[in-house]
A protein has these predicted regions:
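Active-site donor-binding segments of glycosyltransferases and PAPS-dependent sulfotransferases
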Residues: 27-95
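Membrane-proximal helix-turn-helix segments that form the acceptor-binding/catalytic region
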Residues: 125-155, 163
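Conserved donor-binding/catalytic core segment of Leloir-type glycosyltransferases
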Residues: 183, 187-207, 211-224
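Nucleotide-activated donor-binding/catalytic signature segment of Leloir-type glycosyltransferases, i.e.
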Residues: 233-256
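Conserved acidic donor-binding segment of nucleotide-sugar-dependent glycosyltransferases
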Residues: 247, 300-301, 305-312, 319-326
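Acidic donor-binding loop of glycosyltransferase active sites
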Residues: 259-271, 284
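Short hydrophobic beta-strand element within catalytic cores of glycosyltransferases
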Residues: 265, 285-289, 298
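A charged, aromatic-enriched C-terminal amphipathic alpha-helix characteristic of glycosyltransferases
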Residues: 310, 323-354
Length: 358
């Protein structure tokens, strides 16, 4: 077996999925564009890791995102060993790893290439002077993305939301296996919530933390924000005193914040969204934008409240509705258990069997 992953520069949601797969298949060689030493957990670090030529560029782990147009070439020129099965975990180019016939290729797809289809303006910017260059790059990336999709034996999507995106952009059907959430390390304390709401997120444009700040600037209710990112300074500069930025926090600290908060606020559109599931595993409701993966992980009125327009007023109204409900923490927790590590492994095993028999 061979594994493929876009890059190894930190432990985010995709790497948590990869970690569990590596734990199941410790002998599989792992192919990736870039590997930043010390950036991943023991399960991944124990694998034999092969990297692309990009690994040898000075300081690449800091500026690799600017090398996006080189990614297709880099992955296509990697040389995996012969194997019966390739499993790629991909949101960019990992699914383009060359496959030797008669090997089967199972792609666990976080999304069709995010930077080419959905969030390209957030990635490339909106500078009109660069529009012609952006058009050339997008056409190239989209053509490559569709062509390499044809070499995948079977797609597995992280949500029904992404299944529809795979069908739209690739013309391919996909199974759905939800990503694993380690709900066993999360639990209900039984204590009443403290007087603050919570955001746990990377501070980047598409997460829409700016919307939450505008809403809480108006309401003046305490809001704690966990996370770092490119928008940190800009967001902090417009936030009022009731909004506290906590920066990076350990898993244990985040768990305590989940357990203490009044609710989790999730203002952006996500492909799946692990954070809302983690908060629910601690018995806390979620206020979320009614689009994307949140529609599959949150039960409106039972484990959270949706808002349907990305405006401060709509968000504040949903928060007020959430505060007025007497929540059943055990019921909220039960919903989160649908997304456990065990459920993921069962779904993955079924997908592997189906792939090998195609």
């Amino acid at each position: 077996m061979v594994l493929a992953h876009d890059w190894l520069t930190g432990m985010r949601g995709g790497e948590r999925v990869l970690s569990l797969i590596c734990e199941q298949f410790p002998q599989a060689k792992l192919h990736t564009l870039i590997h930043k030493q010390g950036a991943v957990d023991e399960n991944i670090a124990r694998q034999v890791v092969a990297t692309s030529f990009l690994q040898h560029l000075p300081g690449i782990s800091r500026w690799y995102r600017y090398a996006l147009p080189l990614f297709p070439y880099a992955i296509e020129h990697m040389r995996p060993p012969e194997a019966d099965l390739i499993i790629s975990t991909s949101h960019c180019v990992a699914k383009g790893l060359p496959t030797h016939a008669p090997a089967k290729h199972l792609c666990y797809c976080f999304t069709p290439m995010r930077y080419a289809w959905v969030f390209y303006e957030e990635y490339f910017g909106k500078n009109p002077a660069k529009k012609w260059l952006l058009g050339l790059i997008l056409n190239y990336l989209r053509d490559w993305d569709k062509q390499t999709a044809e070499h995948v034996t079977r797609f597995v999507a992280i949500s029904h939301h992404i299944r529809k995106r795979i069908e739209k952009y690739y013309g391919r059907e996909a199974d759905v296996v939800y990503p694993p959430v380690d709900v066993n390390r999360l639990f209900i304390t039984g204590k009443s919530p403290q007087r603050f709401d919570l955001i746990v997120s990377a501070l980047v444009p598409y997460k829409r933390i700016d919307l939450a700040i505008k809403a809480y600037n108006q309401s003046k209710f305490p809001l704690k924000i966990v996370g770092t990112g490119t928008e940190y300074r800009a967001l902090r500069s417009v936030a009022k005193q009731n909004i506290e930025f906590l920066g990076w926090q350990s898993d244990d600290s985040i768990r305590a914040l989940y357990q203490q908060c009044r609710c989790l606020v999730f203002p952006g559109e996500e492909d799946f969204g692990i954070v809302p599931v983690e908060a629910q595993a601690c018995g806390r409701p979620v206020v979320a934008y009614a689009k994307g993966g949140a529609l599959e992980t949150i039960v409106d009125g039972q484990t959270g409240v949706f808002f349907h327009e990305q405006t401060p007023d709509a968000l504040n109204e949903a928060v007020q509705q959430c505060a007025a409900i007497e929540w059943d923490q055990e019921r909220i927790r039960k919903n989160a258990e649908r997304f456990s590590n065990e459920e993921f492994l069962i779904g993955l095993a079924q997908a592997i069997r189906r792939t090998l028999t195609m």
